[in-house]
Amino acid sequence: MKTPQGAEEFIAEQKMIRDEETECANSQYNLGVSLMEQGKLDEAIEAFRDAVADSGRMFEGYVNLGYIYFKKGDLEMVVDVNRKAVQIEPRYARGYANLGFAYLQMMKTGEAIEALNKAIELNPEIVQAWSNLTNAYLQNDDVEMAIETGEKMVEMAPDFALGHNNLASAYFNNDEYKKAIEHLDKAIELGFEPHPEFMKVLEPYR
């Protein structure tokens, strides 16, 4: 890990390289990473934008832009840059997972389901994609698919606390309260803190 002084020196060095080589995408990218690590997000955006402009194939630059825009709460831009990432690298599973999560937050449920299924097709081990897909099916009032997806998720990752919480929600929406309590309790056992209202509505069924 770079010390603050070392990081500042590295940033200065990359800026110097950038100024000397106006079309050096790698230096722009390295500069963006360092600025991002320092929390200088607006400067990092500029560096990554320059990097992807200089290199039409640098999908990693779009990936990092997506992370920054998510930190800034700009979901439209998260979608925009991750779309560009998967256009460059169509087998980039996490790009589709990122798209799916952004669409889910934007209540664009159909797009979320499509993107998350694509992410899982490319890399079934992205547990968060399964979790978000469970929520997307719930958002789409497809409880059966939410349960099926959630069960696959906890079978693959039995210690994924959030996954058990989401599966509990799916079972609750299907009036299967015993199974909802079972998975909620498992989530709590694994260190998850469920929403107090969810715990309250399940209490009469214990």
Predicted regions, residues:
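Structural signature of tandem alpha-helical TPR/SEL1-like repeats
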Residues: 2-16, 38-50, 71-84, 105-118, ...
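Canonical tetratricopeptide repeat
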Residues: 30, 64, 98, 132, ...
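A generic tandem-repeat structural signature
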Residues: 57-122, 128
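TPR/TPR-like alpha-solenoid helical repeat scaffolds
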Residues: 169-173, 193-206
